[in-house]
Every structure is written in structure tokens, then in C-alpha cells.
């Protein structure tokens, strides 16, 4: 049943049914009464004095005026200014005929009679008056002194003025026990934003002015209470709205009436003494009204007396909701300020405000206290406080109040057109206020025209007197369910704030958008229990909430009794969580633990219960209920305490017309993805919607940057490849063909395998240390003249069989390093070149790669037996192993040569220390350039041969 809506979280403001009306004085002078033993002024008869600032032609309701009144012997000078923003341009008035047909009229653009102002030379003062039928209103001098002024009945020009505390009603209360401050802090957790939100509202967005387009309704009993006078009834409702607008200005919120309706021939919905049934009946009627008259919030003023002390009822956090943005208020006072305080309180609940704790309100109880106090002040509260401001900010940050950013169009503002009033109206190009206060460089204040060259003067889509280009972002997407808005290029104002339609999936399909918010069980559990909490299994909800008692229920019914949850609605009752914390975050809340058996193991289900007074138990629903808009199953959402199919949102039907390329906004129009054009997202375009403006074209900057980077990388790779090819070609030339300074600088591209199993002809050729790393041998370079022919091997190189076997490593090393004359390399002074004039540059650091490929076949046919098999040669005693038997004294000469057209792979044929054929041998010496120079050593008795096999190889 709708009356038990768990997520609505209703708060009731309880006051007295009827205050004591101050007794009017029939004679001029003072009327005193006794209160607490001391005489005090009850009321005073005065005649206010008007002084206008207009031209000599006197207006009935001037734009600005000065009013002088006497109060307790003190003259108060009131500086008044007409509240020109009270009525929206679409303001209408509706009444009904005896047959029940509505009659709607648009009020003429006449001077209205509702003012705001201050007391001259008095800080923090405030004045709210109407001058339609005499002067009636509230004069606030300080936080503890205020006066009420009203016309004396049946008198011309005479008025009563008295202190506001003499309107004191019997005290009432609502909701929480406001003496416990922590209760409020816990309730605030419900309006905090989840940590996963992509983006929070900017501070300037929170501080910017918000606008509530209000629709007021007076029921049939209220009409009868005002003596069936339509004008009197309408005047009272407008006066109420004027008060509420003044109250909310301190929160940067303006109240603009878009419509007023009087039920002159019976009620249009069920109105009874039960506030619950009256509220849900009125909200149901209001949903039908939305199709005919757009508004943000609707309030019912009824002459019905509710049960007990209840005089107001409204859902919590419901502002802008299609289904719940509204409230019902009982007219419990003949003075409009009493009903205005009640309506401001109930609208505060719509804004997400809970009741004040004891330390929030600084206004004295004697002057009424604060509007959101749980108990009434004396006589009526008139101010909000810092706690209310913080609650409002949290609500806006969580996604609430999405409809409040758009300012009502003031081009046909009710109350008349005038250059200098600060509102752009028909016939005006701009309006920056009076000449002395205008500081807009784009606007001529004297005649409300744009200065030469200016295209605009106001609005977020106007920059330096020029309209911003179409597609310029003027309002960012604040959170998941919000939508961005873009300048149209035709208007200086940003389009109305739109958001995704209720029922649109969010949070990766784990939740649904509702009223601009995306709520999950996980978030609510963490708000109740702190970080780490998570929702309990579904079985916990089913076992606990079917009880229908204080600890497990689906809200309350029309009579205020706890309602059992049907199995399908169990996840919309008391929320069940799992947490390791000992108790909930709120000090007045206690854990309600239930243990169930699931799959053979125990599961702990943790709910919460907040202790409240007996009078509060029936006035406010449990805040531990699952919030409206929470996903309770596939295509199902919690709504009014029930798990309902999302089809009633009509999201699916609206989404089909977007052709899968967009989402529906709250105006049921498609907001297209980039690349598709509105209104149906079925043709190429830039995205956006007909409501939010066109999205900017996709920027080609990233594409161009990507192409340029790719071209640059490709060019670098090609340059590196070209350099390597050139190095390979230069490295394969003879050293004799290169300048001496460049011979060894191009040897880096040669590859040397570090693997003994490479498949070379001589697998014993290794350039590795025992640790598997190449060992660099540094020996002086052996130089020869460029004209000197390459050495030849001895003529008998190929005779006599194989060369002698190589020596063991330690003997070979000893023989090479022996200082004896037989091991020295002969050099002559004539063969030496002069030392270089400058040191030889170091070899470049080149990467030496491995080559595991098979060697190339020889380019020339090899002889039949180029290397005969080895045979042991006799060694006479004392003969050097490097000399053949019978040789004379050793007179060897070193010869270094690089075979023509030799490849790096062929250079590996020779191993350092290998004995040469017919007594010759190849050996390795170090050079200064870290190269291995394979040197052919010839014996003196042998003739050099034309061919050789010793090569210059890389280190």
C-alpha cells in the first residue's frame, strides 16, 4: 500500500491546531498584559506612513518604498522592494465550476503587492510584507526581536503591531528527539554521496542560486475557511509563498509560483484526517497534473485537522521527483506566517533536511527557533541554520534537486516590465539593473540595449559580450545519472538541467537512476555500519522482514501500523547488512542481529533500530528502511515500500526510439551518444539532445597527433635500418681500402657467436671465457705500410700432412708470453709509422649479436685436400714446439692480412693458437681498438704462399 512507503521517510511537523490569536485593540494606545509577573506590550495601534521613491505620479504598489512604523516607542524605517521574482512567467490561476470543470486564467500584468526589505541601519534585519489589503507581514529586527503587523478589522489605515511571541501556539514536536544530536548525524549519512561517483558538484554549483517552481493548492475546506472568497484564498496562498521565498533566500533558493489552484466545488483528491492517506492521494493527483502544468514541487494547504498534533507531512529527499515531490500542510493559523513556517519545514524534508539537533539552532526559542526544529518555537520559526545548509549540500551532491538549476523565464514576469529591474523582459536586449549599480560592460543600463559590437550581456553561454559557439560545454555532468548541457549558439543562457530518466541502469547495471541518484544496497550498508559493510544475502531480507514488527517490516500502512513484507517485497523493507563492527555508527541505534542457516552454515543478518519517544513512534517512518529507487531485482525497483517492475517508468518504451544510440532524459527525449544526431539518434551527428543542446564535434586533434607520432616512429626506424645497412657494407671492406683512422671504426657490425654449437667448420673455435662470456684481449696493433704486399705462406704449407697439434692452454699461453728471443716479433724502425698526432678515438659501443645460422658455402671451390689429416711430428729434445724438426734459429716475421671479401661467418674458421700448416701458425694478438688480430707467423726457411687463412675478426 502506498501509505507505507519505506523509502519515502516521512517527517511530520507537529504544531498546535490553533494558536491564540492576538486580541485587536479597539482604541488607540497601549494594551498591556501580564506574563511571568512582568507587564509587556501586547499590541499597539498605529498608522504606517508611506514614502515612495517613484515619480510624483503616485503608484498604488511602488517598486521601491519607505515605510515608517512605531513599535514600543521606537520608530522603525522599513526599506522595501517589490519581490519581482515571486511569480514565474507561466503563472496561472485555476478554480473549478460546479460541474467540476477546471477554469484556468492567466493573471494580467498588473502591479502585485508583495515586498521584501530590511530595517534601516539595522544589521541582520528582515522584512516580509504584503500591501494588497492593508499592510500585513513580519518585521524581524534582530535574532530575538520581531514584530507582526496586520490591518485592524473594519478600519481604514489603522494597523496592529505586536511582538511575534504573542502568536505563540502550544508547542508540538516531530520526528527525532532533538535533544540528542547524534541522531541527526546518523540520518545525514543517507544523503552522502558514494565514493564511486565519477564527479562531485563544484563549489560554485553548490553556492549558485536554485529555483523551485512551486504549485500551490487550496482544498475545499481551506476555501470555506476563507469565507468562500476566491480572492482572499488566493491572496493568503500567495502571502504564504512570499514568506517561504524569504526563508529560503538564506540558502540561495528562490521560490517562484508557477500556479495556484483553489478547489471551489469539492476536493480533487481524497482529503481526510489521516495525513498518510491524504499525502499519497495528493501526490497521485499531482502526477496527473504534471502532464498539463510543469512544476518542481506541489504543496497542498488544507483546512482539514489531522489526527493528533500532526499538521504537515512530506517525503524525505523527494524534490524534483515525478512521484513524490510535494507535501500536505494544515492551515492551523489565521496568520499566513504560521502556515508558511509549516510549509517551509515540509519542503525542507523534500530537500533532504532532517530535524535539527540541540546544538544546531542559534535562534532563541522565544523568537521561534529554527524552521527544521523537531518542536515548534514561540511563536513560529523563521530561519534555517548551518546544519540545514550542510544537509542541503549533501543532498545536492548525491544527485538530488536536479531540476533546480534552471531559472524561470522572466521575459513575461508577473508584476510588469521595467528597464532596470535586473530581469530580461520582452523588448529588452539586456538588463543589468539601475544605472548606479550596473557594472556590465556589454549592457547600456539607461535603455537596456547592448553596447555596439556586443551580442549578449548575461548568461553562462556569453563570454566577453559574445555568444559561445554551439556545442560549448556550459554545465558538466555532475554524476552518473546526470547529463551534460551545451550552448546552442543562439541563446546566452545554458539549457535547462536534464538528467537520465528514472529506471535507466547505472553503476554498471547494479542499480537504476531514480530522481537523478544512483542508490545501491552496498552504499546504504556502508552509511549505516561504516567502510567494509556489505549487504546480507537475500534470505536475510526474506526471513526478517516477513515478521511485520518493529525490527522487520516494509514500512507502515495508512493507520500507522507496521506492515508485513510479501516475499517479493522483502528487499524493500528493513535493510540487512553484514559487518564486523560492534554497533551501527549512530549512538541511538542498536544492532538487530538475526542468525539463519543457509547451505548448512550460519549467516548473521544485521539490521538497525533507532529508539524514539512514544510520540515520535507513530509520526516518522524508520530511517533504516531500504531507500526508494534501490534495485531489488532484475527490472525491479523499490518504490513506496514495494518491489515494483520498472516498466511503470516507461523507460524501455522511451529507450526504443533512441535506436540503441542514446538514453532518455527526464523529459523523455533522447540524449544521443557522440556520432549520432537527435531527436532519434538514427542519423550521423555530434550527439546531445534537443533539450541539452548539441554536443561539440569530435576533435581531430588526437587523430592527427596519433598519425604524426606513427610517422615519426616509422621515420626513426627507417633511419636506424639505413645506418645499420651502411655500417654492414663499410665493415666488410678491406682495411687497406679504408683510411687508417676509419679501418677499425666500422668493425662493429660483425657478429660473433657466443654459442659453441653454432655449426661452424671448426667447433673448437671459441671466444669465451670459462664463464661463458667473451674475454677481450688487449694487445698492441701490428702496423705495416700500405704499399707492403700481404704476406704469403711458406711454399711447403700444404705439404707434409697436418700441422702439429695445438698446445694445452697453459703451455700455449706461456709460449706466447715468453720473453725469449724466439717468441719476439721482429720489427724494424723503417716499417714503423710515426705516432699519431692525436689519440685514436675509442671504438663505438655496438651491440654484438649472436648468429646461430649455418655458414654460407665458400664462394670458390676448395682444393681436394686443403687441410690434410693431423699426424704427430717427432720432437727432438729441446726443440721448440713451434719449429719443425731440423729448422735453424727461428727468425719469424709477423704478417697480418684480411682476406678479400671475407664475411663475419668465414672469419670464424681460424682459432687463436692453432698451428699453421708446414710449420706456420696463426695466433691472436690484442689491438688498442679491442679487436682480435689473427697473425700469420712464417718460419724463415719457408717461402710465403699466395693464399692464407688468417683474418681480422671482432673481439
UniProtKB/Swiss-Prot annotation:
Location of the EGF-like domain: 650-682
EC number annotated for this UniProt entry: 3.4.24.-
Record keyword Transferase present: no
Organism lineage string: Eukaryota, Metazoa, Chordata, Craniata, Vertebrata
Feature: compositional bias, Pro residues: 787-796, 833-844
Protein name, UniProt field: Disintegrin and metalloproteinase domain-containing protein 19
Designated gene of the protein: ADAM19
Post-translational modification: The precursor is cleaved by a furin endopeptidase.
Naturally occurring in which organism (per UniProt): Homo sapiens (Human)
Pfam families: ADAM_CR, Disintegrin, Pep_M12B_propep, Reprolysin
Record-annotated Peptidase M12B domain positions: 210-408
Amino acid at each position: 500500500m502506498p501509505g507505507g512507503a519505506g523509502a519515502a521517510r516521512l517527517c511530520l511537523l507537529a504544531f498546535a491546531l490553533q494558536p491564540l490569536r492576538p486580541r485587536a485593540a479597539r482604541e488607540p494606545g497601549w494594551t498591556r498584559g501580564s506574563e511571568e509577573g512582568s507587564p509587556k506590550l501586547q499590541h499597539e495601534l498605529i498608522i504606517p506612513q508611506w514614502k515612495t521613491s517613484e515619480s510624483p505620479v503616485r503608484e498604488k504598489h511602488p517598486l521601491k518604498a519607505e515605510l515608517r512604523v512605531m513599535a514600543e516607542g521606537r520608530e522603525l524605517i522599513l526599506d522595501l522592494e517589490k519581490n519581482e521574482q515571486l511569480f514565474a512567467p507561466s503563472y496561472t490561476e485555476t478554480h473549478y465550476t460546479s460541474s467540476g470543470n477546471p477554469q484556468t486564467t492567466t493573471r494580467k500584468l498588473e502591479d502585485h503587492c508583495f515586498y521584501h526589505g530590511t530595517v534601516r541601519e539595522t544589521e541582520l534585519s528582515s522584512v516580509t510584507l504584503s500591501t494588497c489589503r492593508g499592510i500585513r507581514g513580519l518585521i524581524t529586527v534582530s535574532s530575538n526581536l520581531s514584530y507582526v503587523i496586520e490591518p485592524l478589522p473594519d478600519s481604514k489605515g489603522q494597523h496592529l503591531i505586536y511582538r511575534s511571541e504573542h502568536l505563540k501556539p502550544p508547542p508540538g514536536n516531530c520526528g527525532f528527539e532533538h535533544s540528542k544530536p547524534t541522531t541527526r548525524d546518523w540520518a545525514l549519512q543517507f544523503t552522502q554521496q558514494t565514493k564511486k561517483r565519477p564527479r562531485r558538484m563544484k563549489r560554485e554549483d553548490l553556492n549558485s542560486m536554485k529555483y523551485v517552481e512551486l504549485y500551490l493548492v487550496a482544498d475545499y475546506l481551506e476555501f470555506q475557511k476563507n469565507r468562500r472568497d476566491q480572492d482572499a484564498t488566493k491572496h493568503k496562498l500567495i502571502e504564504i509563498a512570499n514568506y517561504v521565498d524569504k526563508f529560503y533566500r538564506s540558502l540561495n533558493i528562490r521560490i517562484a509560483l508557477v500556479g495556484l489552484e483553489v478547489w471551489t466545488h469539492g476536493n480533487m483528491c481524497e482529503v481526510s484526517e489521516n495525513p498518510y492517506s491524504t499525502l499519497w492521494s495528493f501526490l497521485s493527483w499531482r502526477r496527473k497534473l504534471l502532464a498539463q502544468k510543469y512544476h518542481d514541487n506541489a504543496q497542498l494547504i488544507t483546512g482539514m485537522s489531522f489526527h493528533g498534533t500532526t499538521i504537515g507531512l512530506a517525503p524525505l529527499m523527494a524534490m524534483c521527483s515525478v512521484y513524490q515531490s510535494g507535501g500536505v500542510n494544515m492551515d492551523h493559523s489565521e496568520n499566513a506566517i504560521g502556515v508558511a513556517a509549516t510549509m517551509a519545514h515540509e519542503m525542507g524534508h523534500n530537500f533532504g533536511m532532517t530535524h535539527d539537533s540541540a546544538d544546531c539552532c542559534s535562534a532563541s526559542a522565544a523568537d521561534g527557533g529554527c524552521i527544521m526544529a523537531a518542536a515548534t518555537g514561540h511563536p513560529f520559526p523563521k530561519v534555517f541554520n548551518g546544519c540545514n545548509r550542510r544537509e542541503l549540500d549533501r543532498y545536492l551532491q548525491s544527485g538530488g534537486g536536479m531540476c533546480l538549476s534552471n531559472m524561470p523565464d522572466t521575459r513575461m514576469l508577473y508584476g510588469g516590465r521595467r528597464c532596470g529591474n535586473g530581469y530580461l523582459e520582452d523588448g529588452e536586449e539586456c538588463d543589468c539593473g539601475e544605472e548606479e549599480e550596473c557594472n556590465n560592460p556589454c549592457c547600456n543600463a539607461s535603455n537596456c540595449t547592448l553596447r555596439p559590437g556586443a551580442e549578449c550581456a548575461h548568461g553562462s553561454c556569453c563570454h566577453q559580450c559574445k555568444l559561445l559557439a554551439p556545442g560549448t560545454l556550459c554545465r558538466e555532468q555532475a554524476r552518473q545519472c546526470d547529463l551534460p548541457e551545451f550552448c546552442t549558439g543562439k541563446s546566452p543562457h545554458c539549457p535547462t538541467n536534464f538528467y537520465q530518466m528514472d529506471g535507466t541502469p547505472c553503476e554498471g547495471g547494479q542499480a537504476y537512476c531514480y530522481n537523478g541518484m544512483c542508490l545501491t544496497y552496498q552504499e546504504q550498508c556502508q552509511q549505516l555500519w561504516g567502510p567494509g559493510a556489505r549487504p546480507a544475502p537475500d534470505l536475510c531480507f526474506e526471513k526478517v522482514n516477513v515478521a511485520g514488527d518493529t525490527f522487520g517490516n516494509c514500512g507502515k500502512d495508512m493507520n500507522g501500523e507496521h506492515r508485513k513484507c510479501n516475499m517479493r517485497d522483502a528487499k524493500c523493507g528493513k535493510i540487512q547488512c553484514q559487518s564486523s563492527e560492534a554497533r551501527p555508527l549512530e549512538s541511538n541505534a542498536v544492532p538487530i542481529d538475526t542468525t539463519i542457516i543457509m547451505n548448512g552454515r550460519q549467516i548473521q543478518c544485521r539490521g538497525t533500530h533507532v529508539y524514539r519517544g512514544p510520540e515520535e513512534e507513530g509520526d516518522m517512518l524508520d530511517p533504516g528502511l531500504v531507500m526508494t529507487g534501490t534495485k531489488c531485482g532484475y527490472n525491479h525497483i523499490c518504490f513506496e515500500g514495494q518491489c515494483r517492475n520498472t516498466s511503470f517508468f516507461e523507460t524501455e518504451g522511451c529507450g526504443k526510439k533512441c535506436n540503441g544510440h542514446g538514453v532518455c532524459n527526464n523529459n523523455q527525449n533522447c540524449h544521443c551518444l557522440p556520432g549520432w544526431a537527435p531527436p532519434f539518434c538514427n542519423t550521423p551527428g555530434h550527439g546531445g539532445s534537443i533539450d541539452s543542446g548539441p554536443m561539440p564535434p569530435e576533435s581531430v586533434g588526437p587523430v592527427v597527433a596519433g598519425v604524426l607520432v606513427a610517422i615519426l616512429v616509422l621515420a626513426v626506424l627507417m633511419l636506424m635500418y639505413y645506418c645499420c645497412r651502411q655500417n654492414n657494407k663499410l665493415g666488410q671492406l678491406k682495411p687497406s681500402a679504408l683510411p687508417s683512422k676509419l679501418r677499425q671504426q666500422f668493425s662493429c657490425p660483425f657478429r660473433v657467436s657466443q654459442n659453441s654449437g653454432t655449426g661452424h667448420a671448426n667447433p673448437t673455435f671459441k671466444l669465451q671465457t670459462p664463464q661463458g662470456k667473451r674475454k677481450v684481449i688487449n694487445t698492441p696493433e701490428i702496423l705495416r705500410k700500405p704499399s707492403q704486399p700481404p704476406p704469403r705462406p711458406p711454399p711447403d704449407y700444404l705439404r707434409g700432412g697436418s700441422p702439429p697439434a695445438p698446445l694445452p692452454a697453459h703451455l700455449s699461453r706461456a709460449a706466447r708470453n715468453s720473453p725469449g728471443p724466439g717468441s719476439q716479433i721482429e720489427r724494424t724502425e723503417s716499417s714503423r709509422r710515426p705516432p699519431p698526432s692525436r689519440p685514436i678515438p675509442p671504438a663505438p659501443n655496438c651491440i654484438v649479436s649472436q648468429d646461430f645460422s649455418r655458414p654460407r658455402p665458400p664462394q670458390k671451390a676448395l682444393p681436394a685436400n686443403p687441410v690434410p689429416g693431423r699426424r704427430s711430428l717427432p720432437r727432438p729434445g729441446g726443440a721448440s714446439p713451434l719449429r719443425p724438426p731440423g729448422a735453424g734459429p727461428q727468425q719469424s716475421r709477423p704478417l697480418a692480412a684480411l682476406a678479400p671479401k671475407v664475411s663475419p661467418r668465414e672469419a670464424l674458421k681460424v682459432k687463436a693458437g692453432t698451428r699453421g700448416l708446414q710449420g706456420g701458425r696463426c695466433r691472436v694478438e690484442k689491438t688498442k681498438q679491442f679487436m682480435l688480430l689473427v697473425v700469420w707467423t712464417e718460419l724463415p726457411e719457408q717461402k710465403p704462399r699466395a693464399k692464407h687463412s688468417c683474418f681480422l675478426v671482432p673481439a
